[in-house]
Amino acid sequence: MKLDAPFNLDPNVKVRTRFAPSPTGYLHVGGARTALYSWLYAKHNNGEFVLRIEDTDLERSTPEATAAIIEGMEWLNLPWEHGPYYQTKRFDRYNQVIDEMIEQGLAYRCYCTKEHLDELRHTQEQNKEKPRYDRHCLHDHNHSPDEPHVVRFKNPTEGSVVFDDAVRGRIEISNSELDDLIIRRTDGSPTYNFCVVVDDWDMGITHVVRGEDHINNTPRQINILKAIGAPIPTYAHVSMINGDDGQKLSKRHGAVSVMQYRDDGYLPEALINYLVRLGWGHGDQEIFSREEMINYFELDHVSKSASAFNTEKLQWLNQHYIRELPPEYVAKHLEWHYKDQGIDTSNGPALTEIVTMLAERCKTLKEMARSSRYFFEEFETFDEAAAKKHFKGNAAEALAKVKEKLTALSSWDLHSIHEAIEQTAAELEVGMGKVGMPLRVAVTGSGQSPSMDVTLVGIGRDRVLARIQRAIDFIHAQNA
């Protein structure tokens, strides 16, 4: 049989990996980690990375899911050299190989009815035998190819399938455990396990990195590859990701979609760094640049054990990257969250200033956008607990005094503002907090913000003075 590559197979490329998701839902973190490991291994070996969309499940595959997968890959910045390729667009190729296999006696048509197969399975179960097809149609020449049928792969009946998994070591499965796999359905569509084999062959895939739930598919796929004379790639089956309760990660553990993490305020660098460490390590190092990941990544350092997802660790990493990445870069991601929360940032400080002010305080960009609304728009009410705590005693007097001094400033800068607050406290013979905290609630609506001088510079003179007066009026109204 002849290879039919959908792209030029460069003979100088010694490693070519692929990520092959099924578009039946979003890109989840398990799939993202698999894609990352596959991508890193290709980059580590100066190889190529292929994106393939395995959409043979016509009932469950959707264009929306495909778009979500591609969006997730792009957000994570995992570019591919070839693709995306769609299995539904390669049905002619799969059927061509199946027809050749039938001609060469490597596969055969099966006309058995559902009733016959159900009866066979029932008999085998009664006899405590492993359910498997009995090859009733292997030498049946009494039917026409035009009659409804499936096509089965003629699996070897003797010996074993042995392969050296790059993560798990030697795996051996007896051929007696394997059935004659259906490779083409009655409707003429090829099945998943067969399409994968032809694609890996045609696309020159040298290393298949995928989840451990595919281990049972591997011997079947290897036997088909051997039958058609195709090279056998190296397989690496990575373990599952569990929640912190030890159960398989699912929706009940919170966000499992890659783009949900984007929506929740995580930077792609943080998620990538977290995912690479979720089953792989390089000494005790926790923080990895992308270049370091590429330089250090090896499949034989991937753990065989399941990993537990820890949101607190991810938040720690996210805050690290918020602090350490260039403010201009973080601000671009932050801008998305302002828009998502309906906050108009056209009238206020530069977003890079927001990042600089709040990097030490916020674990996520969503939190950063939410907690900095007051820089860009008016708030409707004061936080009830903060107002009750700080709008009492001589708060109105302190606010009036500090407003007077702020109004008189010739320059609206950090030093001048700090001096005005300090002088107010000195003249009233109170601690800085007796002025600073009522002022904070007055201008932000809450009891939390960066230092007052930084906050006031960011909000701007006119807004600050108007908000102080509003707070004074509020206090008087409460005391009336």
From Swiss-Prot:
InterPro entries according to UniProt: aa-tRNA-synth_I_cd-bd, aa-tRNA-synth_I_codon-bd_sub2, aa-tRNA-synth_I_CS, aa_tRNA-synth_I_cd-bd_sf, Glu-tRNA-ligase_bac/mito, Glu/Gln-tRNA-synth, Glu/Gln-tRNA-synth_Ib_cat-dom, GluQ/Sye
Enzymatic class: ligase
Motif, 'KMSKS' region: chain positions: 248-252
SUPFAM superfamilies: An anticodon-binding domain of class I aminoacyl-tRNA synthetases, Nucleotidylyl transferase
Signal peptide positions on this chain: none
Cellular component aspect of the GO annotation: cytosol
Keyword Metal-binding annotated: yes
Note on how the cofactor is bound: Binds 1 zinc ion per subunit.
Self-association and partners: Monomer.
Protein name per UniProt: Glutamate--tRNA ligase
UniProt source species: Haemophilus influenzae (strain PittGG)
